[in-house]
């Protein structure tokens, strides 16, 4: 007897693929100005980062991804092509909790940082912890932009991976790739760094309405030096 696909748990309609937001989180973002420290020079910061990231976040990521998302990762071998080189990773934004976790498992054992909305460092308690987990909030003014870009350069030069969600807004369980601006690709162009695509897909499970995630890695992709800088970003995006 042929089984039918389960009905959708929720149907959502959109009008603007770039700006519609379906996350339920309501957070008042703090202002990220020139006083924000993207790189903390204090000697205890690295130790705190190790404890928060390796001893807390990674086990939490493993448990959540395996038990809640039933996650599987494909094509991780492509990471070998870049060795110890720092890279950018571009992903589709479809999980409010899973998206901070999935890249850390997919890219393990690399040290991962993420370019995030200021909301992610504005939460009363967790917002104090997220910088130790790798959050790099977008600056709120031009003066803060220099520190932001310097931090990105530093992390790439030390061999870390920086995750970018260019779609910006969360569309839970969305199965397509949304339109996003080519300016999102300016980081690998300016730093002449390789980049990867991280695509999370959703697959039906036999005895559950909640799907399994399968995340694919593709790349590395490099800026085309035969093109002018703006065209390089467009070519990487396409």
PLM features: what roles do these ranges have?
Residues 70-234:
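Soluble catalytic domains of membrane acyltransferases
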Residues 1-88, 98-102, 127, 132:
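Membrane-anchoring hydrophobic helices of lipid-metabolizing enzymes
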Residues 237-238:
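Short, cationic low-complexity segments
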């Amino acid at each position: 007897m042929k089984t039918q696909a389960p009905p959708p748990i929720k149907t959502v309609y959109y009008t603007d693929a770039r700006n519609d937001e379906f996350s339920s989180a309501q957070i008042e973002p703090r202002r990220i100005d020139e006083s924000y420290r993207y790189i903390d020079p204090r000697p205890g910061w690295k130790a705190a980062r190790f404890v928060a990231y390796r001893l807390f976040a990674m086990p939490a990521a493993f448990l959540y991804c395996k038990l809640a998302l039933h996650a599987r990762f494909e094509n991780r071998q492509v990471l070998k092509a870049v060795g110890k080189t720092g890279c950018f990773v571009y992903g589709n934004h479809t999980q409010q909790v899973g998206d901070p976790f999935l890249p850390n498992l997919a890219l393990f054992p690399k040290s991962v940082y993420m370019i995030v909305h200021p909301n992610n460092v504005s939460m009363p308690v967790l917002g104090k912890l997220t910088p130790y987990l790798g959050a790099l909030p977008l600056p709120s003014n031009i003066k803060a932009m220099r520190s932001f870009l310097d931090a990105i350069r530093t992390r790439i030069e030390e061999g870390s991976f920086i995750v970018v969600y260019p779609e910006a807004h969360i569309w839970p369980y969305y199965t397509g790739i949304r339109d996003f601006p080519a300016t999102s690709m300016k980081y690998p162009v300016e730093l002449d760094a390789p980049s990867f695509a991280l695509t999370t897909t959703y697959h039906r499970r036999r005895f559950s309405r909640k799907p399994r995630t399968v995340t694919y890695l593709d790349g590395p992709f490099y800026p085309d030096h035969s093109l002018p800088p703006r065209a390089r970003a467009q070519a990487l995006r396409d």
